[in-house]
Design a protein with these regions (language model features):
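Residue microenvironments linked to proteolytic maturation
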Residues: 14, 19-22, 72-164
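Short conserved beta-strand and strand-loop elements enriched in small hydrophobics
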Residues: 48-62, 73
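Polar/acidic, low-complexity leader/linker segments enriched in S/T/G and N/D
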Residues: 1-51, 160-163
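Extended oligomerization regions of viral-like shell subunits
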Residues: 67-69
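Short, surface-exposed beta-strand/loop "edge" segments at domain boundaries and coil↔beta transitions
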Residues: 26-35, 58-63, 91-98
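Short, flexible beta-strand-to-coil junctions
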Residues: 25-29, 55-59, 119-126
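Short coil-to-beta-strand transition motifs
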Residues: 62-65, 132
């Protein structure tokens, strides 16, 4: 068994001023690795408190790039993935909120390629993930690997998230 670090795409919907509901990761193949639903479900506790940065970085992270934090991770049976609330905060919070609003307004445009990507450490072998060890970050990026996108804006409707 080997340990691997990987960045994976996410999906998101706004649920209030500065808050977004995101689909952090779903079961399936990404970057040559298969992520089984059971492994993702077991990783739920690792997602709470994970920071969101603007852009991935190969260097040490800067506090200037903090855009938010993940809260309330739950298992979403219908999408076979981890769902969580992303709360905007930090020096780059306005970037997150502004881009989210703009992408949601232009959601029908094929040219919009901004979304989220998870930077994770896992154990696996033969192309199959066996255990997620750590979530380093969930980052706002251009052209995420699995096409993570903003889904819809609920904050304009005053809808609060429902976690079943």
């Amino acid at each position: 068994m080997t340990e691997r670090r990987q960045r994976l795409a996410l999906e998101v919907a706004s649920i209030g001023s500065g808050r977004f509901e995101i689909l952090a990761i779903t079961a399936g193949a990404a970057n040559g690795w298969e992520f089984p639903a059971g492994v993702l479900r077991e990783s739920l506790g690792l997602w709470d408190g994970v920071n969101c940065f603007v852009d991935h970085s190969l260097k040490a992270r800067s506090v200037r790039d903090i855009a938010g934090v993940l809260r309330k991770p739950t298992w979403d049976e219908s999408s076979q993935g981890v769902r969580a609330e992303l709360c905007a905060f930090g020096p780059s919070a306005e970037v997150l909120k502004d881009i989210g609003r703009q992408v949601l307004e232009e959601s029908d445009e094929a040219a919009v390629k901004v979304g989220f990507s998870a930077d994770v450490l896992f154990q696996g072998k033969a192309g199959k993930v066996e255990k997620i060890l750590r979530i380093y970050s969930v980052d706002l990026v251009y052209n995420p690997a699995r096409g993570g996108i903003f889904l819809r804006a609920l904050n304009q409707l005053g809808i609060n998230p429902i976690f079943e």
